[in-house]
A protein has these predicted regions:
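Cell-envelope/glycan interface and biosynthesis
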Residues: 1-171
Length: 171
């Protein structure tokens, strides 16, 4: 995708090694992530980005907690091939374990410089951050980029009926 290559080239000129750590994710992979979190096998965060004991929650509350950070299988923007999560590899200390949590992208965080650069530049290349602010659903994800021209087409096609069918036909 040429817009992504150009975004990476311009980031490199600013000393940033913009690297997608997560891109396309099919339904099966998203379901595996979702189910592992639901079963307490993967970390679950509260709305403040702090670890949460998901197994201590009743199913409806657990689902709500998961939806703050993880899309329902079938509804993930990662399914479209237009969205990805990015880090700055140049900013990584040796041995650092990337978490993709807000603290990494906030002032003082390992990827704060990347977040600022993206704030100033991402739209020039046709990208945007679909989870830039808290609108009461998915929590802000400074690391999540979406290619607007392609994602807008996919979003228009994602109707409740399409999502219901995807879930109903899944194992």
């Amino acid at each position: 995708m040429e817009p992504l290559r150009e975004l990476r080239r311009q980031a490199a000129r600013a000393g940033i090694d913009l690297y997608p750590v997560s891109g396309f994710r099919d339904f099966t992979r998203q379901a595996a992530i979702w189910n592992a979190k639901f079963r307490g096998e993967r970390p679950v965060l509260d709305r403040a980005g702090q670890p949460l004991d998901a197994l201590a929650l009743e199913a409806p509350e657990r689902i709500d907690a998961l939806l703050a950070w993880s899309a329902l299988p079938g509804a993930s923007r990662h399914h479209w091939g237009t969205d990805f999560d990015v880090i700055d590899r140049a900013a990584l200390p040796e041995g650092y374990d990337v978490q993709l949590v807000p603290a990494e992208y906030e002032p003082g965080g390992v990827f704060a410089r990347l977040a600022y650069w993206l704030d100033e530049n991402v739209e020039r290349f046709g990208f945007f951050r679909p989870y830039a602010t808290d609108r009461g659903g998915v929590q802000p994800e400074a690391w999540h980029l979406s290619h607007a021209p392609l994602a807008s087409v996919a979003l228009a096609a994602l109707t409740p009926a399409v999502l219901a069918e995807a879930i109903a036909t899944a194992e």
